Amino acid sequence: MKKSIKLTLALSACALLGIGATVWAATAAKGHITIPDGYSELVFNDEFDNTGAPDSTKWGFEQGYLRNGELQYYMPGNANVNCADGVLTIEARNDSVSVDGKIIPITSASIITRPAFTWKYGYVEVRAKIPSSLGTWPAIWMMPAENVYGRWPRSGEIDIMEHVGYDPSKIHFSAHTERFNHTRGTQRTHVIEAPEAVGQFHTYGLKCTPDRLTWLYDGKEQYTIDREENSDWTSWPFDIDYYLIINLAFGGGWGGSQGVDINSLPQRYEIDYVRIFK
């Protein structure tokens, strides 16, 4: 699809920017991207202007049955992912494929920026069109590049956007830490009513600073968490590098808590762009 990109700041496609231990070349194939107020550099982006599999220099794949009792098997490569017309599409299917001699009833995909790109502070924005049927669970989220403070939830998790198909008008923003997480019922979560989100493109953003996390929907701030005075890693582990995950789950402890409609598959989750600024 054609993207609306304003000409405001020339960004060289050859300019190399070091982020943590990662060196990255930010590009803007369709034009020059607006730099948000308070930021000076585009340090990672994908406009998905290629055809076929996503750029392997930017994205990796999770594989297998991974978490939350979900029904889908995450496939590697471009089996359930495709780039065309400036959009990346993740498709959850009821296709009964064979993997290592076993029949997998439901497949989907989860793409990640690790190891290509990790970062600590800045602004991440994803423009996406989410699907909705009984069982769908699309998400945009961040996990630690290294478990500096220990395994989940000790090193944190930031959910930029989550949506479950049985409650289609709501978008969820969350952060999980050792002190504040869903297993304790103490997670920091905010829910907005956004009935227009399903089937239309909208932007989902997160601003990360040393002392604050701020979630945005269509460029408007929706939720903020501030670091408590004298807090330690148990409540604020967000001073380490994270990577980005974009996935479409089906079923599981939350997505399938009201049942699933397997006959609704395939379902498609479309990503117009991913941009990260410093």
Language-model segments: what does each one mean?
Residues K2-A10:
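Bacterial N-terminal signal peptides that target proteins for export
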Residues A10-G20:
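Bacterial N-terminal signal peptides
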Residues W24-K278:
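GH16 jelly-roll
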